[in-house]
Amino acid sequence: MSYDRAITVFSPDGHLFQVEYAQEAVKKGSTAVGVRGKDIVVLGVEKKSVAKLQDERTVRKICALDDNVCMAFAGLTADARIVINRARVECQSHRLTVEDPVTVEYITRYIASLKQRYTQSNGRRPFGISALIVGFDFDGTPRLYQTDPSGTYHAWKANAIGRGAKSVREFLEKNYTDEAIETDDLTIKLVIKALLEVVQSGGKNIELAVMRRDQPLKILNPEEIEKYVAEIEKEKEENEKKKQKKAS
């Protein structure tokens, strides 16, 4: 029997192949990074180069779900659009029903449950996306969650998904400290440094969004990103000079 044809059939060694193939689709997607700071959450995404005549504003990997929650994704953009639309409707429905915005965990659990349902019924296939969901709860606590195509979700301090996730995650494990997220600017720089591990052409291929407590999502413009990249390059040069002085 071909176990990779039926979505609801386990292989003898316990695999659901269609779910694993969806996870492979995520690994081919653009790299996305999320970092939870003290009073800020930051999402960064590797931007693919667009066609010369294409409007790049229509190619977005970061979007707001509600005033206090936003998400970045890696994987199939068309699948992400369905998940985003469903999540936005759920956020609005929650506001109308209980007159409060959703918590970040609530909407993460909703998205994870939606994905999980698509792994358990015939005539459907799993969503080929992983998502980083960030925001603030109404007590002002910053949150970062990650979901995958199987419908599992976890809370993180910092995480990465997509093509370069492994090397970016290794970078974050080494460099994420309380000092590294002491200020908003340092948190933003940490995300940019993490993305520069896999993005070759500097700031012009990075999309960055920040959300601060009681403030809406802000997408940074290319000039702001280039300013941070220039500061990072300058810091690198100064550190190299210090190392050379010590060596001599």
Swiss-Prot record:
What SUPFAM superfamilies has UniProt attached to this entry?
A: N-terminal nucleophile aminohydrolases (Ntn hydrolases) (SSF56235)
List N6-acetyllysine occurrences by residue: K227
What are the UniProt keywords, alphabetically?
Acetylation, Cytoplasm, Glycoprotein, Nucleus, Phosphoprotein, Proteasome
The UniProt entry's GO CC annotations, sorted and at most eight, read: cytosol; nucleus; proteasome core complex; proteasome core complex, alpha-subunit complex
Any Pfam family from its record, for instance, is Proteasome
Spell out the subcellular localization from the entry. Answer: Cytoplasm; Nucleus
User: In its keyword annotation, does this UniProt entry include Thylakoid?
Assistant: no
Residues with glycosylation annotation: S130
Subunit structure, per the record? Answer: The 26S proteasome consists of a 20S proteasome core and two 19S regulatory subunits. The 20S proteasome core is a barrel-shaped complex made of 28 subunits that are arranged in four stacked rings. The two outer rings are each formed by seven alpha subunits, and the two inner rings are formed by seven beta subunits. The proteolytic activity is exerted by three beta-subunits PSMB5, PSMB6 and PSMB7. PSMA7 interacts directly with the PSMG1-PSMG2 heterodimer which promotes 20S proteasome assembly. Interacts with HIF1A. Interacts with RAB7A. Interacts with PRKN. Interacts with ABL1 and ABL2.
Q: Which PANTHER family match?
A: PROTEASOME SUBUNIT ALPHA/BETA
Q: Which NCBIfam families match?
A: PRK03996.1
Please state which protein family the record places this protein in: Belongs to the peptidase T1A family.
User: What is the protein name stated in its UniProt record?
Assistant: Proteasome subunit alpha type-7
Source organism of this protein record: Bos taurus (Bovine)
Lineage, highest ranks first: Eukaryota, Metazoa, Chordata, Craniata, Vertebrata
